[in-house]
Amino acid sequence: MNEQVKTATEQTRELTDEEVRERVIQLAFGGDRERFDMFVSALREALPADVTVVLRGSAVIGVRWEDGAPFDADGPGTSDIDLTLVGGDMLKLWSDDAFYIPKFHTAPLNDETPNHCPSLVPLRRALCRIAGRAVNLQATSSFLQYARDVLMDQPFFTLIEGTKDDADQPEPANGARS
């Protein structure tokens, strides 16, 4: 992790949920709260209630993880939105060859990989239209989501908190965006 990313990560952890939400609206939705609300509504309508939807990456911390460049550094609409679907039966929707960690963490669904999860392609296309930029979807287990936050120090913002059936699920680390 380079210095810009480290600093942005530390600063993000100090923000309130509302401040992170406002950052996301400014960066990813050009300040248009109505488009942000439509985006979240589209997710709520399309996904089961037990699925948590997490936003990661430069839309949350303001810089790219790889090189520390600012969000949309290459021009308006050039940065993507990275969503992770946690829980429910989301992992079962991905094809067997679309996993980074079999049965625990998928590769992203994007323009180049529509066969990873054909059933979510219409949702992804709708989200791209609403956001006016590329949207990547991944699925992960709740344990791996927890590990990414705690072990890898990757901030996230919870767009939708899924209903919980299992009281034994790990809680986010102190200071996690949730």
Q: Would you name each region that the model predicts?
A:
Residues 2-79, 86-178:
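Catalytic core of pol beta-like nucleotidyltransferases
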